[in-house]
């Protein structure tokens, strides 16, 4: 925490622990009490505004800490996902998947590998017979 946040937190604690009027003391009339209350409020306001930007009221250190703390959104997300369960027709899901398979390179590779496998299967069959190989062997190696 920064020093300014610590200072503001201490000021808030000091203001809440300020000495209160003793029950035995009673003011003569209501108007001076209002004036003193207003004067105290203005003084505390000026003290708070002293360490902040002009016209901006300082925020409490606790509120700043809670705002910056990580929040767990798991419960809210699970509630949303379970409440929004809707079945979509198979044709719609297939259409969405097909639209997402556009002209990306990864999609092209899948299409090419399927074609290569088919070509390899065609190439596995041979045109030459065993007699042709033996004839070639005799002619080439001379045995």
Curated annotation (Swiss-Prot):
Signal sequence bounds: none
Write down which residues bear the modification named Citrulline: 7
Which UniProt keywords are given for this protein, alphabetically ordered? Answer: Citrullination, Nucleus, Phosphoprotein
Query: Does NADP show up as a keyword for this record?
Result: no
Tell me one GO biological process term.
Answer: ribosomal small subunit biogenesis
The listed locations are:
Nucleus, Nucleolus
- Region (Disordered): which ranges? 20-66
Instruction: Respond yes or no to whether keyword Ribosomal protein is given for this record.
Output: no
> Mind telling me which GO cellular component terms the entry cites?
cytosol; nucleolus; nucleoplasm; small-subunit processome
Pfam families, A to Z: AROS (PF15684)
Q: What is its main location?
A: nucleus
- Which body tissues produce this protein? Widely expressed with higher levels in submaxillary gland and epididymis.
- Name the Gene Ontology molecular function terms of this record: enzyme binding
Query: What does the record say about PTM?
Result: Citrullinated by PADI4.
Q: Which residues carry this modification: Phosphoserine?
A: 86
Role noted for this protein: Part of the small subunit (SSU) processome, first precursor of the small eukaryotic ribosomal subunit. During the assembly of the SSU processome in the nucleolus, many ribosome biogenesis factors, an RNA chaperone and ribosomal proteins associate with the nascent pre-rRNA and work in concert to generate RNA folding, modifications, rearrangements and cleavage as well as targeted degradation of pre-ribosomal RNA by the RNA exosome. Acts as a chaperone that specifically mediates the integration of RPS19 in state post-A1. Direct regulator of SIRT1.
Q: Which PANTHER family does the UniProt entry name for this protein?
A: ACTIVE REGULATOR OF SIRT1 (PTHR31454:SF2)
What protein family does this chain belong to?
Belongs to the AROS family.
Q: How does it assemble?
A: Part of the small subunit (SSU) processome, composed of more than 70 proteins and the RNA chaperone small nucleolar RNA (snoRNA) U3. Interacts with RPS19; the interaction is direct and mediates the integration of RPS19 in state post-A1. Interacts with SIRT1.
Q: What is this protein called?
A: Active regulator of SIRT1
């Amino acid at each position: 925490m920064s020093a300014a946040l610590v200072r503001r937190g201490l000021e808030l604690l000091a203001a809440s622990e300020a000495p209160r009027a003793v029950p035995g003391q009673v003011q003569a009339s209501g108007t001076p009490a209002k004036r003193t209350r207003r004067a105290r409020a203005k003084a505390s306001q000026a003290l708070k505004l002293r360490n902040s930007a002009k016209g901006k009221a300082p925020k409490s250190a606790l509120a700043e800490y809670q705002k910056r703390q990580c929040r767990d959104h798991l419960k809210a997300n699970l509630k949303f996902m379970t409440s929004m369960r809707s079945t979509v027709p198979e044709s719609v899901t297939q259409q969405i998947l097909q639209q997402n398979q556009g002209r990306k390179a990864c999609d092209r590779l899948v299409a090419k590998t399927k074609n290569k496998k088919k070509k390899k299967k065609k190439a596995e069959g041979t045109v030459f017979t065993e007699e042709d190989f033996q004839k070639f062997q005799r002619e080439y190696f001379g045995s």
